Regions:
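ABC ATPase nucleotide-binding domains
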Residues: 74, 78-80, 84, 88-228
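Conserved coupling/switch loops of ABC nucleotide-binding domains, chiefly the family-specific signature
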Residues: 54-57, 208
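Non-catalytic connector elements of ABC transporters
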Residues: 236, 247-354
């Protein structure tokens, strides 16, 4: 549906977007995820037609809409846009906001407005003014207004960031269902890893203007391509390893990995939930509990290993630990990275032996 080829945007000597290519399929949801200043909003604006690319092209249904010789105006691209400030017209009622971009007779407009108000579960607010409704309600109305002209694509730039935590979670689920119901493709820009993972079919991870990884939420989380990606998406423990004889030596013992991989490995990455922690028997301890954080459904403990390294371990809250408990830590799920921080394929699981 939408394709970007080698897209770039420069502001003088500053490169905001560098050589990015992507393809969005019909009805697909993707998130552009990255830290502040990585170029994700600029990329969205290039797709929307709000910025002209310095290089590269944007195609819609195989027709060029941005490039050296053409720049189709935003209003002719027929994309819906939703921003974090909701951007409702303050002088128009809820129903007039929704009807603003709808073509057709008065009765056709009214029918579409009522259809969308029902879809976002707010038919009772038709006559209200924007200042008379809550932030969550304003965001639902913004979604309804974006959907009203039946757009090809919805572009969302940090749409939930101004809402409190619980409302943000609920609204994210609701809006995803609404957009799926309408069958419209969606691009979400966010710096929130949880938002990207829970909202999207696919995540595009950006850093310093570049696309560093693309994949399903599960692929991005379970198989990060770099150490940076492993830390930016989820919690990660990074531990030093060294090849010795015929195995990879770690704080948990010897790891059985292929020799070619083991000789290149310098860092072991383990997710907090992939550790197994047990009370240590005499002489078996390889760590001491230093901190305990209880958050209801999850207990996270900080463990100082015999190697001097500190790790975070998460698990069930039913077995409570206390500081200075002696523990045995093991893992059978890990990834290996080289000295440059790149993942080594072929080193992703195994067992440790003393």
């Amino acid at each position: 549906m939408i394709e970007c080829r080698n897209l770039a945007k420069n502001y003088g000597t500053l490169t905001a977007v560098s050589d990015i290519s992507l393809h969005l399929r019909e009805q697909e949801f993707i998130s552009i995820l990255g830290p502040s200043g990585c170029g994700k909003s600029t990329l969205l604006r290039l797709i929307a037609g709000l910025e002209v690319p310095s290089a590269g092209q944007v195609f819609l249904q195989d027709k060029e809409i941005s490039g050296k010789k053409i720049s189709l105006p935003p209003e002719r691209r027929k994309f819906g846009m939703i921003f974090q400030d909701f951007a409702l017209f303050p002088h128009l009622s809820v129903e007039d906001n929704i009807a603003f971009g709808v073509n057709g007779s008065a009765s056709e407009k009214q029918q579409r407005v009522q259809e969308l108000l029902k879809l976002v579960s707010l038919p009772q607010l038709a006559k209200k003014m924007p200042h008379q409704i809550s932030g969550g309600e304003q965001q639902r109305i913004a979604v309804a207004r974006a959907l009203a002209p039946r757009p090809r694509l919805i572009l969302m730039d940090e749409p939930f960031s101004n809402l409190d935590y619980q409302l943000r979670q609920q609204l994210r689920r609701d809006i995803r269902e609404i957009l799926k119901h309408e069958g419209v493709a969606t691009i979400l820009v966010t710096h929130d890893q949880v938002e990207a993972i829970t909202f999207s079919d696919r995540v595009l991870l950006m850093r310093d203007g570049k696309l560093v990884q693309s994949g399903t939420p599960e692929e991005i989380y379970q198989h990060p391509q770099t150490l940076w990606a492993s830390s930016f998406v989820g919690e990660a423990n990074h531990l030093s390893v060294e090849w010795q004889a015929s195995a990879l030596n770690s704080a948990f013992g010897l790891l059985n990995v292929p020799e070619a991989i083991g000789k290149e490995a310098r860092i072991l990455m383990v997710r907090p939930e992939d550790f197994v922690v047990e009370s240590a028997t005499d002489g078996e301890s390889n760590g001491i509990v230093k901190t305990v954080d209880f958050s209801g459904s999850v207990q996270t403990i900080g463990v100082e290993l015999n190697s001097g390294e500190t790790i975070q371990v998460s698990g069930s809250p039913h077995l409570l630990w206390t500081p200075e408990d002696s523990v045995t830590i093991t893992t059978e799920r890990y990834l290996c990275f080289d000295s440059a921080g790149n993942r080594l394929n072929g080193c992703s699981s195994g067992s440790a032996s003393k």
